[in-house]
Amino acid sequence: MRVGAEYQARIPDFEPGATKYTDKDNGGMLVWSPYHNIPDAKLDEYIAIAKEKHGYNVEQALGMLFWHKHNIEKSLADLPNFTPFPDEWTVEDKVLFEQAFSFHGKSFHRIQQMLPDKTIASLVKYYYSWKKTRSRTSLMDRQARKLANRNNQGDSDDDVEEPHPMDGNDSDYDPKKEAKKEGNNEQPVQTSKIGLGRREYQSLQHRHHSQRSKCRPPKGMYLTQEDVIAVSCSPNAANTILRRLDMELISLKRQVQNAKQVNSALKQKMEGGIEEFKPPESNQKINARWTTEEQLLAVQGAKHSDHSVFRPFTSSTGICSSSHRSHSNFKSATPVTASSTSCCSCSPPSASAAPTTGAIYSAKANPKSASPTAHPPS
């Protein structure tokens, strides 16, 4: 034993005015102190900006304002420089967590994919607080769970077993009732697991989960009772059905490929345009003035052609119309009767047009001397 004055504690003298704890002993940090010069409306606006744009909660936003000595402009400028710790759960976060938990169970890594701003520790912490309050408040979930258990028990014999106390199921029932059920069903479950390996025991545990007892196919895949019966009727039936489905899939892919090729060929044809399919446009213009060569051709055609070939002959020149050509020819020659000045639709000119032919021929041989007798129309 350590006995003596040197082993005793030194007790200081009593001082009535001294405080028990000094400022140095206080390890806490002041994060907010109200300032009377800031109006409440302006403070609420600052908190709203910090929450909506930067994800701060009320305590973090006020702490930033207190750090800058109640200067709102400096606090707003400094808000983007820090990433707040998302510890506050909004109504949207709670709804997303419940939906993610119904899909993935206690797989918090998958739940975090739906709530990326929450850490795993925050998810676990909220899960246990939510689990405690859910059994007291969620009466609708409790009734739905009971009805689901009854339906599962009526559908198959595999789901008749009650939940085991060691399977970690998160039940919404009353803990006292659960304890009674566990005590009553403990012995039959233990006897049924004799001789089972570890894997068989784990598979048996998974069957106790009422929500996970039904194995659903992946998204986009649908199973019917007829298909399941057809597959299970014989050992080779599954391979036969799958081979047939593969052939149908290959044929559908070929049809799609052929349709793509036809569409690409049509697109290439459309890109070429319709210029090659347009009829050629004639650049010749109709001229009302007659040259000497045209007059000679018209007279020769009228002399050597009958009424049936007069129209194609007049269209062979390609410059003047037939009506204008016949009228201008006989008008420029010697005077003739009205019957001789017919167009292409009338009878061919008579013998009275013979002097005109001679005059035109003489005009071609000697233009100077023939100018009084025949001249082209003006």
UniProtKB/Swiss-Prot annotation:
Residues 84-135 form the SANT domain. GO terms for biological process: negative regulation of DNA-templated transcription; regulation of transcription by RNA polymerase II. Residues 147-219, 337-356 are annotated as: Disordered. InterPro entries: ELM2_dom, Homeodomain-like_sf, REST_helical, SANT/Myb, SANT_dom, Trans_reg/Corepressor. Residues 162-184 have a biased composition (Basic and acidic residues). SMART domains: ELM2 (SM01189), SANT (SM00717). Residues 205-217 have a biased composition (Basic residues). Residues 238-273 form a coiled coil. Signal peptide: none annotated. Keywords: Coiled coil, Nucleus, Repressor, Transcription, Transcription regulation. May act as a component of a corepressor complex that represses transcription. Belongs to the CoREST family. This is REST corepressor 3.
